[in-house]
Design a protein with these regions (language model features):
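Structural preference for beta-strand elements that scaffold enzyme active sites
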Residues: 2-6, 46, 77-81, 101-104, ...
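Charged helix-capping and loop-helix junction motifs
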Residues: 60-70, 153-158, 184-192
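Conserved, mostly hydrophobic/aromatic
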Residues: 8, 39, 47, 95, ...
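Conserved anion-binding
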Residues: 15, 19-23, 96, 100-180
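Catalytic cores of alpha/beta
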Residues: 76, 80-102, 189-226
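Short, acidic/polar
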Residues: 28-40, 87-93, 153-163, 215
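Glycine-rich, proline-tolerant flexible connector loops at the mouths of alpha/beta enzymes
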Residues: 46-67, 107, 173-184
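Glycine-rich phosphate-binding active-site loops on the catalytic face of alpha/beta enzymes
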Residues: 94-115, 176-179, 207-214, 221-241
């Protein structure tokens, strides 16, 4: 199972949101480049970077964050997976130009899947990942959310996964919004179901990881990757311990 330590950026600062809510932002007194170097020293080979300003359409902060992505790429040998505010082909190329190894497509893929497929043809399935962020509605149906989780799409999560897998996509980052930043454990059953729906799409679990036991459960169920953010920032465990856990 591939581990992706995460850095969320807002105006160049390392932050975390609670369930994607910008009104519930925690700022960390950590330099993004130094944090990336620390994760590399702990054994990381991938880094997940989210441009929160880009997701909100705030240009000044997005420029600052892009510069930081470029700095991280220069300062480390980490493979960077990054998303947030990717809306056009120029945005995709800009992220690759900054040193990203993989670009995450969120709202644009859900709203205009034919455009996402066009970019897959241009850049290749290995270079792109889908961000499918979902929350269960009152009937227990997981609905995909877009626009920084502010809008609910009509799309049902499992239908989306099956459709994108059939279209030739390879990677998908799936967040259970209700668990994001809650440190309450991941929704293992959800990821197992996603794997059953489409084994071809390699799913990265995001949201809720708070202890090594969570990683053990995901790994035991054959989940291909996991995003770890708040747990590392708040010292619940070290990345080196997490790597050893999934390698055991």
């Amino acid at each position: 199972m591939q581990l992706y330590p995460a850095i969320d950026l807002r105006s160049g600062r390392v932050v975390r949101l609670l369930q994607g809510d910008f009104a519930h932002e925690t700022r960390y007194a950590k330099n993004a480049v130094e944090l990336a170097k620390h994760y590399e020293a702990e054994g990381a080979n991938w880094l997940h970077v989210v441009d929160l300003d880009g997701a909100k359409g705030e240009v000044a902060g997005a420029i600052e964050n892009l510069n930081l992505i470029e700095e991280i790429a220069r300062a480390t040998s980490l493979k960077i997976q990054t998303g947030g505010g990717v809306r056009t082909e120029a945005d995709v190329r800009q992220r690759f130009g900054a040193g990203a190894a993989r670009v995450v497509l969120g709202s644009v893929a859900v709203k205009t899947p034919e455009l996402a497929s066009h970019w897959r043809d241009i850049f290749g399935a290995e270079k792109l990942a889908l961000a499918l962020d979902a929350r269960a509605d009152p009937f227990g149906v997981y609905r995909v959310h877009t626009a920084g989780w502010q809008e609910t799409a009509e799309a049902e999560l499992f239908e989306c996964v099956a459709r994108f897998a059939a279209a030739g996509f390879k990677h998908a980052l799936v967040t259970d919004i209700a668990l994001d930043g809650m440190m309450a454990g991941p929704n293992v059953a959800l990821y197992v179901k996603l794997k059953e729906v489409s084994a071809e799409l390699l799913v990265q679990a995001s949201g809720g990881v708070s202890q090594l036991m969570d990683l053990r459960a995901l790994n035991a169920n054959g989940i291909s990757g996991v995003i770890i953010g708040k747990a590392l920032l708040e010292g619940k465990f070290k990345l080196s311990e997490a790597i050893a856990e999934v390698a055991a």
